[in-house]
Amino acid sequence: MPQVETAMGSIDVDDIGMCLMHEHIIIADWDMRQNYDDYVDVEKEVPKAVGSLNKAKERGVKTIVDLTPVNLGRDIRSIIAVSKASGVNVICPTGFYWTEEAWMHGWDANHLSTYMIRDITEGILDTNVKAAIIKCATDHTGVDEFNKKLLHSTAIAHRETGAPISTHTTVANSSARDQVAAFKEFGVDMSRVVIGHLGDSTNIDYLEEILSSGCFIGMDRFGLEAFLPTDERVQTVVTLCEKGYAGQMVVSHDACSFQDFFDGEYVEKFAPNWCYEHVPRDVLPALLAGGVSQADVDTMMVANPKKIFSAKGGY
């Protein structure tokens, strides 16, 4: 039986169960944290995250994938603490966000990939917890020269280790299309890639174009009503299931118990359902009511995550 690394050690892929494939626990910039002691109160935020995950756990969630990149504030010790206290498996990430960090400019893709490979093969810091998925991102700047270097480094680490790739995209510039093209150029097996945030789009032709590459797509921002209302997100998934694509979709929120992008009270006001329990509590019943079969729900929530983490070995 294939295994996958988590914050609590390796588990059989059969034990992943219902899985939210694109989430975050704590996002907080490390430069700020190291210079301002009160930037984030981890002792407060860890129990808060545990409480939020416990609500999802009560509704059947067994595993989440934390996709916080290294340079977006990945906090492996908090991830471990939250996983242990909640009993929810957390699959941990490596990889870099789309932002142009000054230190990156003097290094090529091969050098950047060495850090990801180390996280996957040796473990993160001194924790012995190994990353099991590679995060990368393309945003409003698109796949420019710098971003292509990041995608190339991701591809190198993926092909060396076999760890799957999960991405951040924006629908405003159709960056998913350019990510697919770049990964194909770098020899990536697209069946081992999740192209993220495509649930922000209702353009079925565009989604089918991305799906035709053989990748998975993330319908993974449920609860972000400001980007797209839940009913429209649900209908898009319903339509794609009717077209036979359940085997290539994963469903999640891109939620975060704490993030330094916004004031917490503001988030609760503009996105009250942007939380780990929204999918099992509200979205899955809505999909069933919309005509999606229980078998297709199980495929998206259980079988597809298992498949993503079952493919092993570099190539």
Question: Where are each of the predicted segments found?
Answer:
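Mid-to-C-terminal alpha-helical segments outside catalytic/metal-binding sites
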Residues: 2-9, 274-315
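Alpha-helical scaffold segments that flank or form the walls of functional sites
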Residues: 17-26, 34-89, 110-130
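Short acidic/histidine-rich active-site segments
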Residues: 67, 166, 220-221, 245-269, ...
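Catalytic pocket-lining loop regions of alpha/beta-barrel enzymes
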Residues: 159-242, 248-249
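Divalent metal-coordination and catalytic microenvironments
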Residues: 22, 64, 158, 217, ...
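Active-site gating/metal-coordination segments in enzymes
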Residues: 81-84, 89-161, 216, 222-226
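Histidine/acidic-residue-rich catalytic or RNA/ligand-binding cores of hydrolases
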Residues: 29-33, 76, 175-181, 203-211, ...
